Amino acid sequence: MSTIKRYFGLYVIVGMIACLSVPVSAAETYKFGIVPQQSGSRLSKLWTPILEYLETKTGYKFQFATARNIPTYEKRLLNGKYDFAYMNPYHYIQYQNQAGYNAFAKAKQKRLKGILVVHKDSPYKRIEDLHDAEMAFPSNAFAANLVPRAIMAQADIGFSPKFVASHDSVYRNVAKGRYPAGGGVMRTYRNTSPEYRDNLRILWTSEGYTPHAFAAHPRVPQHVVDEVQRAMLEMDRDPRGKALLKSIRLKGIEAGQNLEWDDVRALNIKS
């Protein structure tokens, strides 16, 4: 009996050592939230391969996450539901302050520009032609909503905003003639279904701003953030990584620091 106990004890000890020898990263899973500019299924198709790529480069596990609409995404950011998050510039300056998210990366060589789209056969030629029009906007989006609304208000162009769930919803509604115009950004416009894009044209484009932030919640260890940042910054040097970036219309990813979003703070936009 004592021999059995000795072997059993040895088995337990060996098992414990084996468990302790597994890299910590193998047990870690981080929730990566993506702003719902497009449908959840579309975002999952685009971003899941990117997260899988980052898994192979860092050894950490990433769970794709989004929300059914932007207000829900905002609540989850406020409550710190995402370990990592890709968020628009306005969200970043809000939730850096309210929830502690800290930017570590952004799109390379990119300035975020808002656009207003109309049906391809629309008579509208200038932004002033939209006076008194009903216009579709994605709820609380920065360049697709807050910027064009602020510009139109400054120019005394009256309009009636109608809020929809996503950028794709804007493009679909304008393409189908439900609204004469709507707000978006170039990246989602290029990414939207040709069924909608081929029936639209861009009426107006804003000036450029610091783009969306890749940010980490303060609970994520700094060495993990550093490893994720390194992997993202190296994507455009690798054929597979470059192809994945191309799928989301990015040339590359570069380091980002909090102060780089001061141009957005200077707008003093109130949603």
Enumerate the language-model features and the residues they cover.
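Periplasmic-binding protein-like
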Residues: 31-37, 43, 109-118, 195-232, ...
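A structural signal for short loop-to-beta-strand junctions that line the ligand-binding cleft
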Residues: 99-108
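Short helices/loops that flank or line small-molecule/ion binding pockets
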Residues: 71-85, 98-99, 128, 168-183, ...
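Short loop->beta-strand "edge-of-pocket" segments that line small-molecule binding or catalytic clefts
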Residues: 28-37, 43, 128-144
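Bacterial N-terminal signal peptides
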Residues: 10-19
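Extracytoplasmic small-molecule ligand-binding "clamshell" domains
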Residues: 27-91
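Pocket-lining segment of extracytoplasmic ligand-binding domains
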Residues: 122, 132-223
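Sec/Tat signal peptide C-region and signal peptidase I cleavage site
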Residues: 22-26
